[in-house]
Structures are given as structure tokens and as C-alpha cells.
A protein has these predicted regions:
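Eukaryotic serine/threonine protein kinase catalytic domain
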Residues: 24-194
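Intrinsically disordered, low-complexity regulatory segments that flank or precede the catalytic domain
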Residues: 1-32
Length: 194
């Protein structure tokens, strides 16, 4: 078994997709058996995201499933640990909330807030482009998130339409914090592709 420290026993109960969130600690650690697994919402380099329902509460989540062997092969262990650590510290209405993490012999799991509107990229592709008021509306939300993160010495480093989700009210939620970083001074690390 490949052992990577990746455990947090907390869940956010989000009944009926209301905007009010209640954070509570579960009496036992999370495991895959706690959830009814639904359809795949998306796939990535070393995992996929599926919609799940927490059996005990009926709450709906997005479960990010990361294959350990691929995380290690692609040298992404530090990014995954960093993502978990940073998301667990974030509390902002435009950032996807991390509810809990767990693992089994093959996978790392991140239980995340399910955002019903899907990827911003899909909406942008469908629209072709947004008018100026809509563009300002979305840009202002990204700026507010960056302002919040920078005030806590975190930087995001992976802004793209695929990492923005739309909630049921049309507001953005930023997701995928694998490249985010805690920076007290300057950083000279480049992210992305050539």
C-alpha cells in the first residue's frame, strides 16, 4: 500500500443545495462506503470527479478521486498535499469548500462542495463571449478571491475557465488548488505549459 498522509474527518452538510453551510465533524473517518457514487463530472491527468451522495445525511458532494500511482508517477504528491492544506484554510463564498479527505490503498479522495452550474468554460464556449457587464461581474469575483488569498499570503497560479465553476445563482467558485502556494516573500516558480 502506498501511504500518503491525506486525512481529515470533517464534512460540510449542504442539505437541499441551500446557500447556508454547516460545518460538522463526523464521528468516524470518511470512507468510500459512506457515499452513493454517481456519474462522472470530469476527468483529469490522474483522476476524476464524481457526484456522490453522503448516505447518512443525503447531502450531495463532488468527490475528487486521485489515483495514487499516477500522482506519484507524475510527481504531484506535494501539489496534492498543498491543495488539501490550502483548501482546508480557505473560507470564501467564491472558493469551492473542502468537506473532507480520505484514502484507500489505490486512491486519494477529496470531498468537495458540489457546484451545480458546471464549468465556466462550457458556458463561455456556448456564449462565444460575454458582454462587458457580465465580464466585469465574473472578473470582480476572481479579483475578490485573489485579494482574499493574497491577504493570507497564498497565490493561486492556475487561473483558466476550466477551473471556474458556476453555482445555482450564477456566481463563480474557483476550484483546483494544486498549483496554489503559500508565499511570504517572492516566488520564481513557473507554472503551466510552454
Amino acid at each position: 500500500m502506498i501511504k500518503i498522509f491525506f486525512c481529515r474527518e470533517q464534512v460540510i452538510d449542504k442539505r437541499e443545495m441551500s446557500s447556508a453551510l454547516v460545518v460538522r465533524t463526523l464521528p468516524t473517518p470518511l470512507c468510500l462506503n459512506n457515499f452513493e457514487i454517481g456519474v462522472t463530472l470530469g476527468t483529469g491527468s490522474f483522476g476524476r470527479v464524481r457526484i456522490v451522495t453522503h448516505k447518512a445525511t443525503g447531502s450531495i458532494w463532488a468527490l475528487k478521486m486521485l489515483k495514487k500511482s499516477e500522482v506519484i508517477r507524475l510527481q504531484q504528491v506535494e501539489h496534492m498535499i498543498s491543495e488539501k492544506s490550502i483548501l482546508s484554510r480557505m473560507d470564501h463564498p467564491f472558493i469551492v469548500r473542502l468537506a473532507g479527505t480520505f484514502q484507500d490503498p489505490k486512491y486519494l479522495y477529496m470531498t468537495l462542495e458540489y457546484v451545480v452550474g458546471g464549468e465556466f468554460f462550457t458556458h463561455l464556449r456556448r456564449a462565444g463571449r460575454f458582454d462587458h457587464p457580465a465580464a466585469r461581474f465574473y472578473a470582480s469575483q476572481v479579483i475578490l478571491v485573489f485579494e482574499y488569498m493574497h491577504a493570507s499570503d497564498f497565490i493561486y497560479r492556475d487561473l483558466k475557465p476550466e477551473n471556474l465553476l458556476l453555482d445555482k445563482n450564477g456566481y463563480l467558485k474557483i476550484t483546483d488548488f494544486g498549483f496554489a502556494k503559500y508565499v511570504v516573500f517572492k516566488t520564481y516558480t513557473l507554472c503551466g505549459k510552454d
